[in-house]
Design a protein with these regions (language model features):
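Glycine-rich beta-strand-centered segment in the early N-terminal region that forms part
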Residues: 1-45, 86-89
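Short, well-ordered alpha-helical microsegments
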Residues: 23, 128, 196-197
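Buried hydrophobic positions in well-ordered alpha/beta secondary-structure cores of metabolic enzymes
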Residues: 12-14, 27, 41, 73, ...
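Conserved beta-strand positions in the Rossmann-like core of class I SAM-dependent methyltransferases
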Residues: 15, 143-144, 211
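NAD(P)H dinucleotide-binding glycine-rich loop of Rossmann-like/cofactor-binding domains
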Residues: 40-122
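Glycine-rich cofactor phosphate-binding loops and adjacent beta1-alpha1 units
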Residues: 111-115, 136, 153-211
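Mid-domain Rossmann-like dinucleotide-binding core that forms the NAD(H)/NADP(H) cofactor-binding site
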Residues: 84-169
Length: 211
């Protein structure tokens, strides 16, 4: 919407609450969910809050109402969209919870990863690293990351030495060489590039899960 201040990844301090808000109070440090949602419609109850049918639901912050780059933000359905930050967690540590880490968590959850799987993650940017952290919780047999940026690849190599690395040009052959069934059992495409979606399918084994 023209004139709306953008921004949807944020943490903040509650300044005031509406009469129906029960879970947070002024002074609380909170994370802010990337999407607003009612929690009561068909899609919310199924966990697909991005498809909330409420007029105030969906992509509101930074799209229809002022977002995180504004000094003050109004968050509809604050009981669903705000989460208190523990005193032991800094604002910087909590920042990714509302969107990027949640993206990796949800992608991992719906990918049905098992301990026997070879998992390919395409992209090692912030979303890719958050996805990696969530995938590691599933303890798959093998994790491969495809990343063309040398700095990002070096970061992965330094901090996650057990993760295999390859570049896009060699990715298909590398994955097939390092998998047990002709390709990755699970592919998570988090790069969003022009060719990465097609690459994901090329690297997946028959009947694989591509997210």
């Amino acid at each position: 919407v023209p004139g709306v201040t953008v921004g949807h990844e944020m943490v903040g301090v509650v300044e005031a609450v509406g009469a129906d808000v029960k879970t947070v109070k002024p002074g609380d440090r909170v994370t802010v969910n990337v999407e607003t949602f009612c929690g009561e419609c068909f899609f919310c109850k199924k966990g697909f809050v991005n498809n909330c049918t409420d007029p105030h639901g969906g992509w509101a912050l930074g799209c229809r109402i002022d977002g995180g780059q504004a000094e003050y933000v109004r968050v509809p359905y604050a009981d669903q969209g705000l989460n208190k930050i523990p005193d032991s967690v800094t604002d910087e540590q909590a920042l990714f919870v509302g969107d990027i880490l949640a993206t990796g968590f949800w992608a991992t959850r719906i990918s049905e990863i098992t301990e026997e799987d070879t998992v390919l993650i395409i992209g090692a940017g912030p979303t890719g690293i958050c996805t990696l952290l969530c995938v590691m919780l599933k303890q798959p047999k093998r994790i491969i990351i495809c990343e063309k940026d040398a700095v990002r690849a070096e970061f992965v190599s330094k901090h996650y030495p057990d993760v295999l690395l390859c570049e896009p040009e060699e990715c298909e052959a590398f994955v097939k060489e390092h998998s047990d069934h002709g390709g990755a059992d699970v592919v998570l495409e988090v790069a969003g590039g022009r060719d990465t979606f097609q690459l994901a399918w090329k690297c997946a084994r028959p009947n694989a899960i591509v997210t």
